């Protein structure tokens, strides 16, 4: 299940609406909504873990490359005339490396999605109270409360 942040926002825009005429059904729908978004959370959490491992692997690969310790065949395809030994210089090269940056951006994207889903799950957990308050307000307006 691959979902983008935009798709996630569209899904929540639709799912967040509470039908005032069917509060009983909305109440019964809470567990399935929670399951839906918790499944998404777990999937994205695992994708983030995978991306973290990829970043570690790429960082090691690029460190070897920039320090001149990579397999000689690598330099035939992609020559690098320097051998970086200084820690600060190495960090600058790693920070500027496109492969490493792309993986870091992917992790940041997953973090944004996870934070968004966490906020959705909090709203879903409070939905029972929202529905209860809506029912009490309807009773009050009809003179029953």
Residues covered by each model-derived region:
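Charge-rich amphipathic alpha-helical interaction elements
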Residues: 1-145
